[in-house]
Swiss-Prot record:
The keyword Cell division applies. Belongs to the EPSP synthase family. MurA subfamily. Keywords: Cell cycle, Cell division, Cell shape, Cell wall biogenesis/degradation, Cytoplasm, Peptidoglycan synthesis, Pyruvate, Transferase. GO terms for cellular component: cytoplasm. This is UDP-N-acetylglucosamine 1-carboxyvinyltransferase.
Amino acid sequence: MDKLVIHGGRRISGTVAASGSKNSSLPIIAATLLAEKGTFTLHRIPELHDIETFTQLLQHLGVETTFNNNTLRVSTENVQSILAPYELVKKMRASIYVLGPLLARFGEAKVSLPGGCAFGPRPIDLHLMAMEKLGAEIKIETGFITASVKGKKLRGAHIDFPVSSVGATGNALMAAVLAKGTTTITNAAAEPEIETLCHFLSAMGACIDGTGTTKLVIEGVATLQAIEFTNVFDRIEAATLLAAAAITGGSITLNGVEPSQLKAVLKKFVHAGCQISTQSDSVTLISPEQLLPTDVTAKPYPSFPTDMQAQWIALMTQASGKSLITDRVYHERFNHIPELNRLGAHIEIKNNQAVVHGPRKLSGTTVMSTDLRASASLVLAGLVAEGITEVLRVYHLDRGYEKIEMKLNALGAQISREKYKEFS
Protein backbone atom coordinates (compact mmCIF):
# COMPACT_ATOMS: atom_id res chain seq x y z
CA MET A 1 0.00 0.00 0.00
CA ASP A 2 0.96 3.65 -0.41
CA LYS A 3 1.30 6.28 2.27
CA LEU A 4 2.00 9.99 2.12
CA VAL A 5 4.85 11.34 4.22
CA ILE A 6 4.28 15.03 4.91
CA HIS A 7 6.90 17.39 6.33
CA GLY A 8 4.73 20.05 7.96
CA GLY A 9 5.19 23.75 8.51
CA ARG A 10 5.58 24.84 4.89
CA ARG A 11 3.43 27.57 3.41
CA ILE A 12 1.25 26.67 0.41
CA SER A 13 1.42 29.49 -2.14
CA GLY A 14 1.39 29.89 -5.90
CA THR A 15 -0.77 29.29 -8.95
CA VAL A 16 -2.32 25.99 -9.99
CA ALA A 17 -4.90 24.74 -12.49
CA ALA A 18 -7.98 22.89 -11.26
CA SER A 19 -8.54 19.33 -12.44
CA GLY A 20 -11.66 18.07 -14.16
CA SER A 21 -14.50 17.00 -11.90
CA LYS A 22 -14.64 13.37 -10.83
CA ASN A 23 -18.26 13.69 -9.74
CA SER A 24 -19.35 14.89 -13.18
CA SER A 25 -17.03 12.55 -15.10
CA LEU A 26 -18.65 9.39 -13.77
CA PRO A 27 -22.27 10.03 -14.88
CA ILE A 28 -21.01 11.45 -18.19
CA ILE A 29 -19.03 8.27 -18.85
CA ALA A 30 -22.05 6.17 -17.86
CA ALA A 31 -24.25 8.17 -20.23
CA THR A 32 -22.12 7.11 -23.20
CA LEU A 33 -23.91 3.75 -22.93
CA LEU A 34 -27.03 5.47 -24.28
CA ALA A 35 -25.58 5.90 -27.79
CA GLU A 36 -25.64 2.92 -30.15
CA LYS A 37 -23.16 4.32 -32.68
CA GLY A 38 -20.10 6.55 -32.88
CA THR A 39 -17.18 7.44 -30.64
CA PHE A 40 -17.23 9.92 -27.78
CA THR A 41 -14.26 12.19 -27.10
CA LEU A 42 -14.33 13.43 -23.51
CA HIS A 43 -11.80 16.07 -22.44
CA ARG A 44 -10.64 17.11 -18.97
CA ILE A 45 -11.27 13.70 -17.41
CA PRO A 46 -9.08 13.35 -14.29
CA GLU A 47 -6.63 10.46 -13.87
CA LEU A 48 -8.13 8.81 -10.79
CA HIS A 49 -8.65 5.31 -9.46
CA ASP A 50 -12.42 5.78 -9.63
CA ILE A 51 -12.21 6.72 -13.32
CA GLU A 52 -10.02 3.68 -13.98
CA THR A 53 -12.46 1.42 -12.13
CA PHE A 54 -15.43 2.85 -13.99
CA THR A 55 -13.82 2.44 -17.40
CA GLN A 56 -12.94 -1.15 -16.46
CA LEU A 57 -16.62 -1.69 -15.69
CA LEU A 58 -17.62 -0.34 -19.09
CA GLN A 59 -14.96 -2.48 -20.77
CA HIS A 60 -16.49 -5.51 -19.06
CA LEU A 61 -19.80 -4.58 -20.68
CA GLY A 62 -18.10 -4.48 -24.10
CA VAL A 63 -17.31 -0.78 -24.36
CA GLU A 64 -14.05 0.21 -26.07
CA THR A 65 -12.04 2.95 -24.31
CA THR A 66 -8.70 4.72 -24.64
CA PHE A 67 -7.40 7.28 -22.15
CA ASN A 68 -4.49 9.65 -22.77
CA ASN A 69 -3.62 13.08 -21.36
CA ASN A 70 -7.00 13.53 -19.65
CA THR A 71 -8.90 12.70 -22.85
CA LEU A 72 -11.13 9.62 -22.81
CA ARG A 73 -12.43 8.11 -26.04
CA VAL A 74 -15.40 5.79 -25.73
CA SER A 75 -17.17 3.59 -28.28
CA THR A 76 -20.33 1.84 -27.08
CA GLU A 77 -21.41 0.17 -30.33
CA ASN A 78 -20.43 -3.34 -29.26
CA VAL A 79 -21.89 -3.64 -25.77
CA GLN A 80 -22.11 -7.39 -25.12
CA SER A 81 -23.35 -7.59 -21.54
CA ILE A 82 -25.86 -5.98 -19.18
CA LEU A 83 -24.14 -7.49 -16.10
CA ALA A 84 -22.09 -5.25 -13.77
CA PRO A 85 -20.21 -7.74 -11.54
CA TYR A 86 -19.41 -7.49 -7.85
CA GLU A 87 -15.65 -7.56 -8.46
CA LEU A 88 -15.84 -4.11 -10.08
CA VAL A 89 -18.94 -2.58 -8.51
CA LYS A 90 -17.75 -3.24 -4.94
CA LYS A 91 -14.95 -0.71 -5.40
CA MET A 92 -17.21 2.32 -5.79
CA ARG A 93 -20.82 3.29 -5.24
CA ALA A 94 -20.99 5.31 -8.44
CA SER A 95 -21.09 2.03 -10.37
CA ILE A 96 -24.86 2.19 -9.84
CA TYR A 97 -24.85 4.86 -12.58
CA VAL A 98 -24.87 2.12 -15.25
CA LEU A 99 -28.34 0.98 -14.12
CA GLY A 100 -30.32 3.77 -15.82
CA PRO A 101 -28.47 3.75 -19.15
CA LEU A 102 -28.57 -0.05 -19.47
CA LEU A 103 -32.30 -0.12 -18.73
CA ALA A 104 -32.96 2.71 -21.18
CA ARG A 105 -31.00 1.16 -24.04
CA PHE A 106 -31.53 -2.57 -23.53
CA GLY A 107 -34.59 -2.84 -21.32
CA GLU A 108 -32.71 -4.88 -18.74
CA ALA A 109 -29.77 -4.67 -16.36
CA LYS A 110 -28.13 -6.70 -13.62
CA VAL A 111 -25.97 -4.64 -11.29
CA SER A 112 -24.23 -5.79 -8.12
CA LEU A 113 -25.05 -3.88 -4.97
CA PRO A 114 -22.41 -1.11 -4.75
CA GLY A 115 -19.44 -0.37 -2.48
CA GLY A 116 -17.42 2.84 -2.04
CA CYS A 117 -16.79 5.13 0.92
CA ALA A 118 -17.64 3.60 4.29
CA PHE A 119 -19.49 6.32 6.16
CA GLY A 120 -23.11 6.18 7.25
CA PRO A 121 -26.09 4.87 5.30
CA ARG A 122 -26.17 5.81 1.61
CA PRO A 123 -29.18 3.88 0.33
CA ILE A 124 -29.87 3.18 -3.31
CA ASP A 125 -33.62 3.10 -2.67
CA LEU A 126 -34.16 6.37 -4.55
CA HIS A 127 -32.42 4.99 -7.65
CA LEU A 128 -34.66 1.93 -7.59
CA MET A 129 -37.80 3.97 -6.94
CA ALA A 130 -37.04 6.12 -9.99
CA MET A 131 -36.55 3.07 -12.22
CA GLU A 132 -39.82 1.55 -10.98
CA LYS A 133 -41.66 4.80 -11.70
CA LEU A 134 -40.38 4.56 -15.27
CA GLY A 135 -41.82 1.06 -15.61
CA ALA A 136 -38.98 -1.23 -14.56
CA GLU A 137 -39.52 -4.33 -12.48
CA ILE A 138 -36.85 -4.50 -9.78
CA LYS A 139 -35.67 -7.53 -7.82
CA ILE A 140 -32.83 -7.70 -5.30
CA GLU A 141 -31.47 -11.20 -4.86
CA THR A 142 -28.09 -12.83 -4.21
CA GLY A 143 -26.43 -9.42 -3.93
CA PHE A 144 -27.64 -8.14 -7.30
CA ILE A 145 -30.18 -5.63 -8.56
CA THR A 146 -32.02 -7.28 -11.43
CA ALA A 147 -34.11 -4.86 -13.48
CA SER A 148 -36.24 -5.45 -16.55
CA VAL A 149 -38.88 -3.64 -18.60
CA LYS A 150 -41.83 -5.20 -20.39
CA GLY A 151 -41.54 -4.43 -24.07
CA LYS A 152 -37.93 -3.27 -23.48
CA LYS A 153 -39.02 0.39 -23.38
CA LEU A 154 -39.22 2.62 -20.31
CA ARG A 155 -42.22 4.95 -20.04
CA GLY A 156 -42.24 8.59 -18.97
CA ALA A 157 -43.49 9.27 -15.45
CA HIS A 158 -43.53 11.78 -12.60
CA ILE A 159 -40.64 11.14 -10.21
CA ASP A 160 -40.78 13.10 -6.96
CA PHE A 161 -37.72 12.54 -4.79
CA PRO A 162 -38.48 12.80 -1.04
CA VAL A 163 -34.92 14.07 -0.49
CA SER A 164 -32.43 15.57 -2.90
CA SER A 165 -30.04 12.96 -4.32
CA VAL A 166 -27.35 13.65 -6.91
CA GLY A 167 -26.89 10.00 -7.80
CA ALA A 168 -30.59 9.17 -8.08
CA THR A 169 -31.28 12.32 -10.11
CA GLY A 170 -28.49 11.40 -12.51
CA ASN A 171 -29.73 7.84 -12.92
CA ALA A 172 -33.32 9.01 -13.45
CA LEU A 173 -32.16 11.52 -16.07
CA MET A 174 -30.18 8.94 -18.02
CA ALA A 175 -33.08 6.49 -17.95
CA ALA A 176 -35.69 9.09 -18.93
CA VAL A 177 -33.98 10.51 -22.03
CA LEU A 178 -34.82 7.38 -24.06
CA ALA A 179 -38.15 6.64 -22.34
CA LYS A 180 -41.39 6.88 -24.26
CA GLY A 181 -43.21 10.10 -23.39
CA THR A 182 -42.57 12.84 -20.85
CA THR A 183 -40.81 12.47 -17.51
CA THR A 184 -40.97 15.12 -14.80
CA ILE A 185 -38.45 14.98 -11.96
CA THR A 186 -39.28 17.15 -8.94
CA ASN A 187 -36.95 17.87 -6.02
CA ALA A 188 -34.15 17.02 -8.43
CA ALA A 189 -30.60 17.68 -7.31
CA ALA A 190 -29.35 21.00 -8.72
CA GLU A 191 -25.62 20.40 -8.20
CA PRO A 192 -23.28 21.56 -11.00
CA GLU A 193 -22.53 17.90 -11.74
CA ILE A 194 -26.21 17.31 -12.62
CA GLU A 195 -26.29 20.52 -14.65
CA THR A 196 -23.24 19.28 -16.56
CA LEU A 197 -24.92 15.92 -17.17
CA CYS A 198 -27.96 17.76 -18.56
CA HIS A 199 -25.72 19.73 -20.93
CA PHE A 200 -23.99 16.52 -22.01
CA LEU A 201 -27.25 14.66 -22.66
CA SER A 202 -28.72 17.66 -24.48
CA ALA A 203 -25.67 17.82 -26.73
CA MET A 204 -26.26 14.13 -27.50
CA GLY A 205 -29.77 15.02 -28.64
CA ALA A 206 -31.85 14.68 -25.48
CA CYS A 207 -34.75 17.06 -24.82
CA ILE A 208 -34.41 18.42 -21.28
CA ASP A 209 -36.08 21.51 -19.81
CA GLY A 210 -35.18 23.04 -16.43
CA THR A 211 -31.42 22.45 -16.47
CA GLY A 212 -29.88 23.87 -13.29
CA THR A 213 -33.16 23.80 -11.34
CA THR A 214 -34.90 21.34 -9.04
CA LYS A 215 -37.58 20.54 -11.63
CA LEU A 216 -36.53 18.72 -14.77
CA VAL A 217 -38.85 17.87 -17.65
CA ILE A 218 -37.54 15.29 -20.12
CA GLU A 219 -39.19 14.43 -23.42
CA GLY A 220 -37.95 11.02 -24.50
CA VAL A 221 -36.23 10.68 -27.87
CA ALA A 222 -35.61 7.64 -30.07
CA THR A 223 -31.82 7.82 -30.33
CA LEU A 224 -28.82 9.73 -29.00
CA GLN A 225 -25.52 10.52 -30.73
CA ALA A 226 -21.87 10.27 -29.72
CA ILE A 227 -20.28 13.71 -29.21
CA GLU A 228 -17.12 15.58 -28.19
CA PHE A 229 -17.42 17.24 -24.78
CA THR A 230 -15.25 19.08 -22.23
CA ASN A 231 -15.79 18.33 -18.55
CA VAL A 232 -16.15 21.01 -15.86
CA PHE A 233 -13.67 21.70 -13.05
CA ASP A 234 -13.66 19.80 -9.75
CA ARG A 235 -15.12 22.21 -7.22
CA ILE A 236 -14.19 19.98 -4.25
CA GLU A 237 -10.55 19.69 -5.30
CA ALA A 238 -10.52 23.46 -5.85
CA ALA A 239 -11.95 24.16 -2.39
CA THR A 240 -9.48 21.71 -0.83
CA LEU A 241 -6.54 23.52 -2.44
CA LEU A 242 -7.89 26.84 -1.15
CA ALA A 243 -8.04 25.29 2.32
CA ALA A 244 -4.43 24.10 1.97
CA ALA A 245 -3.29 27.67 1.42
CA ALA A 246 -5.51 29.02 4.20
CA ILE A 247 -4.42 26.50 6.84
CA THR A 248 -0.72 27.18 6.18
CA GLY A 249 -1.00 30.96 6.00
CA GLY A 250 -0.30 31.08 2.28
CA SER A 251 -1.90 32.52 -0.83
CA ILE A 252 -3.08 30.75 -3.94
CA THR A 253 -4.59 31.40 -7.35
CA LEU A 254 -6.72 28.67 -8.92
CA ASN A 255 -7.16 28.80 -12.69
CA GLY A 256 -9.77 27.03 -14.78
CA VAL A 257 -12.64 27.36 -12.30
CA GLU A 258 -16.15 28.83 -12.31
CA PRO A 259 -16.31 31.00 -9.16
CA SER A 260 -20.12 30.95 -9.14
CA GLN A 261 -20.03 27.24 -8.34
CA LEU A 262 -17.82 27.94 -5.30
CA LYS A 263 -19.97 30.74 -3.90
CA ALA A 264 -20.96 29.02 -0.62
CA VAL A 265 -17.39 27.92 0.11
CA LEU A 266 -15.84 31.28 -0.78
CA LYS A 267 -18.31 33.03 1.53
CA LYS A 268 -17.09 30.88 4.43
CA PHE A 269 -13.44 31.58 3.61
CA VAL A 270 -14.24 35.31 3.81
CA HIS A 271 -15.95 34.79 7.19
CA ALA A 272 -12.79 33.00 8.32
CA GLY A 273 -10.78 36.13 7.54
CA CYS A 274 -9.38 35.26 4.11
CA GLN A 275 -9.25 37.75 1.26
CA ILE A 276 -10.96 36.40 -1.86
CA SER A 277 -10.87 37.87 -5.35
CA THR A 278 -12.36 36.31 -8.47
CA GLN A 279 -12.04 36.63 -12.22
CA SER A 280 -14.20 34.92 -14.83
CA ASP A 281 -12.20 31.69 -14.59
CA SER A 282 -9.99 32.08 -11.51
CA VAL A 283 -10.05 32.52 -7.74
CA THR A 284 -7.34 34.00 -5.53
CA LEU A 285 -7.16 33.48 -1.76
CA ILE A 286 -4.87 35.37 0.64
CA SER A 287 -4.74 34.05 4.19
CA PRO A 288 -5.14 36.25 7.28
CA GLU A 289 -2.59 36.36 10.09
CA GLN A 290 -5.11 34.47 12.22
CA LEU A 291 -8.06 32.42 10.98
CA LEU A 292 -11.42 33.21 12.55
CA PRO A 293 -13.81 30.51 13.83
CA THR A 294 -16.55 29.91 11.28
CA ASP A 295 -19.54 27.60 11.60
CA VAL A 296 -20.73 25.63 8.59
CA THR A 297 -23.75 23.46 7.88
CA ALA A 298 -23.32 21.08 4.97
CA LYS A 299 -26.45 20.78 2.83
CA PRO A 300 -27.26 20.14 -0.84
CA TYR A 301 -26.09 22.66 -3.45
CA PRO A 302 -26.00 25.66 -3.52
CA SER A 303 -25.20 25.39 0.21
CA PHE A 304 -21.84 24.37 1.68
CA PRO A 305 -20.97 20.91 0.27
CA THR A 306 -20.81 17.81 2.45
CA ASP A 307 -17.66 16.84 0.53
CA MET A 308 -15.86 19.83 2.13
CA GLN A 309 -16.90 19.46 5.77
CA ALA A 310 -13.96 17.20 6.73
CA GLN A 311 -11.48 19.66 5.23
CA TRP A 312 -13.24 22.56 6.96
CA ILE A 313 -12.93 20.82 10.31
CA ALA A 314 -9.18 20.50 9.73
CA LEU A 315 -9.00 24.19 8.80
CA MET A 316 -10.89 25.27 11.91
CA THR A 317 -8.33 23.57 14.19
CA GLN A 318 -6.21 26.66 13.42
CA ALA A 319 -8.97 29.24 14.01
CA SER A 320 -9.04 31.38 17.15
CA GLY A 321 -12.09 29.98 18.92
CA LYS A 322 -14.90 27.45 18.71
CA SER A 323 -16.45 26.37 15.41
CA LEU A 324 -19.53 24.21 14.91
CA ILE A 325 -19.74 21.94 11.87
CA THR A 326 -22.99 20.18 11.01
CA ASP A 327 -23.63 17.79 8.13
CA ARG A 328 -27.28 17.60 7.06
CA VAL A 329 -26.46 15.25 4.17
CA TYR A 330 -24.50 12.50 5.94
CA HIS A 331 -25.07 12.94 9.66
CA GLU A 332 -22.40 10.41 10.69
CA ARG A 333 -19.60 11.54 8.38
CA PHE A 334 -17.09 12.17 11.16
CA ASN A 335 -14.63 9.26 10.87
CA HIS A 336 -11.78 11.73 10.41
CA ILE A 337 -12.21 13.33 13.84
CA PRO A 338 -10.40 10.69 15.94
CA GLU A 339 -7.46 10.84 13.53
CA LEU A 340 -7.33 14.65 13.63
CA ASN A 341 -7.36 14.46 17.42
CA ARG A 342 -4.35 12.12 17.25
CA LEU A 343 -2.49 15.01 15.62
CA GLY A 344 -3.36 17.25 18.57
CA ALA A 345 -6.69 18.72 17.52
CA HIS A 346 -9.46 19.23 20.10
CA ILE A 347 -12.67 18.17 18.39
CA GLU A 348 -15.79 16.81 20.06
CA ILE A 349 -18.94 15.29 18.59
CA LYS A 350 -22.13 16.48 20.26
CA ASN A 351 -25.62 15.81 18.87
CA ASN A 352 -24.33 14.93 15.39
CA GLN A 353 -22.30 18.13 15.37
CA ALA A 354 -18.54 18.58 15.39
CA VAL A 355 -17.28 21.14 17.90
CA VAL A 356 -13.79 22.32 16.95
CA HIS A 357 -11.74 24.17 19.58
CA GLY A 358 -8.89 26.23 18.15
CA PRO A 359 -6.25 27.23 17.61
CA ARG A 360 -4.31 24.06 18.37
CA LYS A 361 -0.69 23.29 17.69
CA LEU A 362 -0.67 20.04 15.73
CA SER A 363 2.18 17.54 15.90
CA GLY A 364 3.01 15.01 13.23
CA THR A 365 2.23 11.34 13.78
CA THR A 366 0.83 8.39 11.85
CA VAL A 367 -2.85 8.60 10.91
CA MET A 368 -5.13 6.43 8.79
CA SER A 369 -7.53 7.43 6.04
CA THR A 370 -11.06 6.07 6.32
CA ASP A 371 -12.68 7.62 3.24
CA LEU A 372 -11.95 10.03 0.40
CA ARG A 373 -12.63 13.38 2.05
CA ALA A 374 -11.37 12.24 5.46
CA SER A 375 -8.01 11.55 3.86
CA ALA A 376 -7.96 15.08 2.44
CA SER A 377 -8.57 16.52 5.91
CA LEU A 378 -5.60 14.54 7.26
CA VAL A 379 -3.35 15.87 4.49
CA LEU A 380 -4.41 19.44 5.34
CA ALA A 381 -3.66 18.84 9.02
CA GLY A 382 -0.31 17.30 8.12
CA LEU A 383 0.64 20.41 6.14
CA VAL A 384 0.40 22.58 9.26
CA ALA A 385 1.55 20.00 11.83
CA GLU A 386 5.02 20.26 13.33
CA GLY A 387 7.27 17.42 12.22
CA ILE A 388 6.36 14.49 10.00
CA THR A 389 2.86 13.16 9.42
CA GLU A 390 2.31 9.81 7.73
CA VAL A 391 -1.11 9.31 6.14
CA LEU A 392 -1.84 5.63 5.56
CA ARG A 393 -4.30 4.05 3.11
CA VAL A 394 -4.08 6.90 0.63
CA TYR A 395 -5.87 4.78 -1.95
CA HIS A 396 -8.90 6.59 -0.57
CA LEU A 397 -7.30 9.90 -1.55
CA ASP A 398 -6.40 8.60 -5.00
CA ARG A 399 -10.07 7.90 -5.69
CA GLY A 400 -10.85 11.61 -5.90
CA TYR A 401 -7.71 13.79 -6.07
CA GLU A 402 -5.56 13.86 -9.18
CA LYS A 403 -1.83 13.82 -8.35
CA ILE A 404 -2.53 15.76 -5.16
CA GLU A 405 0.98 15.48 -3.70
CA MET A 406 2.49 16.75 -6.96
CA LYS A 407 0.17 19.76 -6.98
CA LEU A 408 0.88 20.57 -3.34
CA ASN A 409 4.63 20.12 -3.78
CA ALA A 410 4.55 22.56 -6.69
CA LEU A 411 2.95 25.03 -4.27
CA GLY A 412 5.62 24.61 -1.60
CA ALA A 413 4.74 21.43 0.29
CA GLN A 414 7.19 18.61 0.99
CA ILE A 415 5.27 15.38 0.49
CA SER A 416 6.56 12.00 -0.66
CA ARG A 417 4.68 8.84 -1.57
CA GLU A 418 6.12 5.66 -0.09
CA LYS A 419 5.21 1.98 0.07
CA TYR A 420 4.38 0.26 3.34
CA LYS A 421 3.07 -3.09 4.55
CA GLU A 422 -0.08 -3.15 6.60
CA PHE A 423 -0.19 -5.75 9.35
CA SER A 424 -3.45 -7.59 9.91
